[in-house]
């Protein structure tokens, strides 16, 4: 049984092939963290032994860069040991006192696997990894929406300061429908009572109508808005409203997937 120690990095990995007695098979070699790099690794191993079953792989859980290589090896039914980096520190220090080359870590990892003095890092299964990635993406998108809302509020304070507070929720359905069409006092006034009333009635499911439209136009006519760059800011607000709508739709899709995957855990 051969042992392949792999020193994980972001763009490329270093590998060393070791025999059971601790001697190395040839020199250590580098391969890229790509499909082509994986194929290069397989070719290198095939030159030593044609069966992947005769190799055991060892790697440290370094960030997330090991995941791609790990999953490709696992899909090929290889035996892979993922160890905590702290477990190889003592042996690493002994080697570093003697020499320091790019291949040292790969040899150390192979040696740790050969000696067997390690405990494997508990790996998440496909469902857990999927759930983690889905939740991370959701948090990322939610943060983007929050940032857009803050920017919109700042811009609206300049072009229509009285608008905030007119609706109980500036980003509720009724207010969103308005801001997608008109944002400045001038635009709202020109849009007209009838158009505003119709827009509000549809967006609010009949809760608002002509009365609310008239109140908004009155607010617009008496606004103490900054007139500098109002057209530019209006354009930016409308674009950000569109971006926010897209992000919220994407969040909804993610939440459906998260709910579906959560049910698969049987909880």
PLM regions: where:
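A detector of single, family-specific signature residues
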Residues: 1-267
């Amino acid at each position: 049984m051969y042992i392949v120690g792999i020193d994980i990095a972001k763009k490329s990995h270093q590998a060393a092939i070791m025999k059971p007695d601790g001697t190395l098979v040839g020199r250590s070699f580098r391969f890229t963290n790509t499909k082509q790099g994986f194929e290069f690794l397989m070719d290198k191993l095939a030159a030593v032994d044609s069966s992947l079953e005769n190799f055991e792989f060892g790697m440290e859980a370094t960030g997330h860069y090991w995941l791609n290589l790990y999953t490709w090896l696992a899909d090929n039914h290889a035996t892979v040991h993922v160890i905590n980096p702290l477990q190889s520190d003592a042996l690493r220090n002994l080697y570093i006192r003697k020499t320091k080359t790019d291949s040292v870590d790969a040899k150390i990892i192979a040696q740790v696997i050969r000696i067997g003095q390690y405990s494997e890092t508990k790996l998440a299964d496909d469902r857990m990894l999927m759930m983690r990635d889905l939740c991370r993406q959701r948090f990322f998108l939610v943060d983007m929406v929050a940032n857009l809302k803050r920017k919109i509020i700042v811009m609206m304070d300049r072009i229509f300061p009285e608008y905030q507070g007119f609706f109980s929720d500036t980003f509720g359905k009724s207010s969103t429908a308005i801001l997608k069409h008109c944002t400045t006092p001038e635009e709202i006034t020109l849009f007209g009572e009838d158009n505003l009333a119709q827009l509000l009635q549809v967006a609010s499911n009949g809760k608002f109508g002509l009365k609310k439209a008239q109140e908004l136009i009155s607010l617009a006519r008496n606004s103490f808005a900054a007139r500098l760059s109002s057209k530019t800011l209006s354009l930016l607000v409308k674009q950000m409203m569109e971006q926010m709508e897209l992000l919220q739709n994407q969040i909804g899709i993610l939440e459906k997937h998260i709910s579906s995957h959560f049910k698969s855990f049987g909880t």
